[in-house]
């Protein structure tokens, strides 16, 4: 077990280092690019497509990934001659964060509109929307031309202020969403719901206004987070602010785990973002001097984590669409096709330019209403599922089996003759009678039988109404003769 774990981790490190670019001349390491991070996210999506991950295992793996990123960046940045990253590169990172936050906001908002009972989802969407405000402010600051050391210090200080308040807004709104998690009484009370939303406006609107006024836009109330040294062209980061952020992220991560137990699909993603932000700020604590390289690395961690969140949300949407498509044409109880799909299939067959031999069967479970009345609907459902399983074992894989209503099923067969249709129908009838007999493996209370009405056509008819009418006549004829029979009509 230990050896296999070492091999797996070795392969992971080998893949990660192949994506990581090290410049020997500059002696520093940069995180994987956005494209490489997408490769990692896609690998996760493929693995999730093959097996359904539990929330706990998903979070543990994300924890290991983020810690590995943190250790690698810290290791390669010790005692290095750090150089400034070009301003345009940093602008690209901020723009990437802007679009990632916008995408996550839209996903969260759409998820809320699909189920307006989930108030925490709406509050979380506001958390990502608030980040867009700070990122717009940051982009405007970066675009300002540099005319001396004073403006460099001002730009660095403003970027730091918006960075701090962006995290504070996210922490406050996430904490409020966490407070509402699992409290249905808030949703039932409109006054409480309105109060919660008004409270959410403080970090959503008041914090950005406060950050704007504490920046260089208002000289009377400026907050100085960064001290610029013109001699060596470095800016010293206020470490106390980082310590506060580290504590807040750590407490938020702890309470998310304790409150939600990572039970839903959404909260493990939020926990991952908290963990990434925690590591970003811890990375800043490990260095004595503020510089754009380390800032760029921390933003790279945030980009990677949010790329993964976006990838998972897209994967989740495709899963829900797949489930919705399946429910649209499948019966919930028996997991076979429903009436709508069956009739569409028959109409599609009859509308072909050339229609070959085909057969439609209607199957009715004899004495099913008595089973429901005597044993209850729970046993009745078990009988339905059992007979469906027996019928599926008696027909070909490409044949269509659908539940039309109650205990009536429809089957559509193609590429067979009348004799083959009779053989299949008799096989179904005998198997149901035999496999539901005494001490059967399906645990149905008594032996069951079915009646089958069959209509066979050589392809001359194109009228679905005629086909279904003849099949229904054959079924009623089989039941009128005592049931447990197969009657075939030809058209």
Swiss-Prot record:
GO terms for biological process: cell adhesion involved in single-species biofilm formation; negative regulation of bacterial-type flagellum-dependent cell motility. GO terms for cellular component: plasma membrane. The keyword Transferase applies. The lineage of its organism: Bacteria, Pseudomonadati, Pseudomonadota, Gammaproteobacteria, Enterobacterales. It is found in: Cell inner membrane. It is a multi-pass membrane protein. Residues 76-89, 143-158, 215-236, 287-293 are periplasmic. The chain crosses the membrane at residues 55-75, 90-110, 122-142, 159-179, 194-214, 237-257, 266-286, 294-314. This is Probable diguanylate cyclase CdgI.
């Amino acid at each position: 077990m230990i050896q296999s774990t070492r091999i797996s981790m070795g392969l992971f490190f080998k893949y990660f280092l192949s994506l990581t670019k090290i410049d020997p001349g500059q002696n520093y390491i940069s995180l994987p690019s956005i494209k490489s991070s997408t490769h990692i996210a896609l690998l996760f999506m493929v693995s999730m497509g093959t097996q359904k991950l539990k929330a706990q295992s998903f979070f543990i793996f994300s924890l290991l990934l983020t810690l590995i990123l943190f250790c690698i960046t810290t290791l390669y940045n010790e005692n290095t001659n750090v150089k400034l990253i070009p301003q345009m590169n940093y602008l690209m990172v901020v723009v990437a964060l802007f679009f990632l936050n916008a995408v996550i906001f839209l996903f969260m908002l759409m998820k809320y509109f699909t189920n307006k009972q989930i108030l925490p989802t709406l509050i979380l969407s506001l958390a990502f929307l608030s980040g867009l405000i700070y990122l717009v402010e940051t982009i405007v600051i970066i675009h300002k031309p540099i005319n001396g050391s004073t403006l460099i210090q001002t730009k660095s200080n403003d970027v730091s202020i918006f960075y701090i308040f962006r995290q504070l807004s996210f922490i406050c709104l996430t904490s409020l969403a966490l407070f509402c998690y699992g409290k249905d009484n808030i949703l039932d009370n409109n006054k409480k719901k309105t109060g919660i939303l008004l409270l959410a406006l403080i970090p959503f609107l008041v914090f950005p206004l406060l950050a704007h006024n504490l920046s260089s836009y208002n000289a009377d109330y400026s907050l100085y987070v960064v001290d610029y040294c013109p001699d060596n062209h470095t800016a010293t980061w206020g470490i106390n602010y980082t310590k506060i952020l580290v504590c807040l992220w750590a407490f938020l991560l702890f309470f998310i785990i304790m409150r939600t137990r990572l039970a839903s699909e959404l909260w493990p993603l939020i926990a991952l973002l908290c963990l990434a932000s925690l590591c970003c700020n811890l990375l800043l604590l490990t260095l004595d001097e503020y510089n754009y390289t380390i800032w760029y690395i921390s933003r790279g961690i945030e980009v990677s984590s949010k790329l993964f969140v976006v990838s998972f949300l897209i994967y989740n949407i495709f899963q829900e669409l797949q489930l919705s498509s399946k429910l649209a044409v499948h019966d919930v109880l028996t997991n076979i096709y429903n009436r709508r799909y069956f009739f569409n299939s028959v109409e599609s067959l009859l509308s072909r330019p050339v229609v070959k031999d085909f057969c439609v069967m209607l199957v009715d479970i004899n004495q099913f209403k008595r089973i429901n009345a005597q044993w209850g609907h729970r046993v009745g459902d078990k009988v339905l599922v059992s007979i469906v399983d027996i019928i599926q074992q008696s027909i070909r894989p490409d044949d269509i089996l659908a539940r039309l209503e109650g205990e009536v099923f429809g089957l559509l067969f193609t590429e067979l003759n009348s004799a083959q249709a009779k053989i299949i129908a008799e096989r179904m009838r005998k198997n149901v009678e035999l496999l539901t007999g005494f001490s059967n493996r399906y645990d149905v209370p008594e032996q069951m039988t079915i009646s089958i009405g069959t209509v066979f056509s050589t392809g001359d008819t194109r009228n679905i109404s005629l086909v279904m009418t003849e099949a229904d006549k054959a079924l009623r004829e089989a039941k009128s003769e005592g049931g447990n029979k197969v009657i075939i009509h030809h058209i």
